Amino acid sequence: PFCNLLHFNRDRAALAAARGLKASSIRDPKVLIVAPMSGHHATLLRGTVEAFLPDSEVYVTDWIDARHVPVLEGRFDLEDYVAYVREMITALGEDVHVVAVCQPGPPTLAAIALMAEDADPARPASMTFMGSPIDARKSPTVPNKLAEERPFEWFRDNLIYTVPAMYPGTMRRVYPGFLQLTGFINMNYDRHVDAHWNFFNRMIDGDGDSTDKHRAFYDEYLSVM
């Protein structure tokens, strides 16, 4: 109930024509893109998916907003995350290439390590980590330092909220996306201020293309779970 595995359909006839082949002869590699579960939706990876589509059968994890998952479905923790990733890799079969983008790096590595330990025949052909903090202690940033300075109870009391009654997941305890978004913005505060200032100036100048790109980015970036 916490994730859907999406497969992107491709125009095989157009691909075959472009390659001078029969559609039935196309055997492109399978690529599983593990999207972050860090407040945003998988749509943030639209550009990544588009880049893989011409040469790959692309699958992506579409994590469900926890406020839409009833409490009766149980909790979702790190062990569940690892189990979900392993189950999806197994479902796609051997020879799949796994690409974890940012946050899912550690749980994806754990899932594949468990598959290797068990000599699972469905273990992937390759794994790629893009911007993933495998060992965050090696390059500590502000969030790392905050995690070391605060006790566990502080995070529980200040960052975990209860889903309100208007949603199917009412009473579920979650870390809401708006808090993560606030952290993201504060880490690059000057950059976001400059972006909006430039946006304002471009509107005055009548630069429609640039303003449309700005709106499109922030419509996506500000949409959180």
Each model region followed by its residue ranges:
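Short, surface-exposed "cap/lid" segments of acyl-processing enzymes
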Residues: 1-69
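A short secondary-structure junction signal
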Residues: 17, 43-46, 109-111, 138-142
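Beta-sheet entry/capping signal
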Residues: 30-31, 57-58, 95-98, 125-127
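Domain-level signature for proteins that mediate thiol-based redox and metal-cofactor handling
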Residues: 34-37, 42-43, 70-85, 116
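Generic beta-sheet signal
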Residues: 61, 99-101, 130
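Conserved acidic catalytic loop of the alpha/beta-hydrolase fold
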Residues: 68-70, 80-97, 109-113
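Alpha/beta-hydrolase-fold enzymes
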Residues: 93-94, 111-225
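Gly/Ala-rich beta-loop-alpha elbow adjacent to hydrolase catalytic centers
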Residues: 100-108
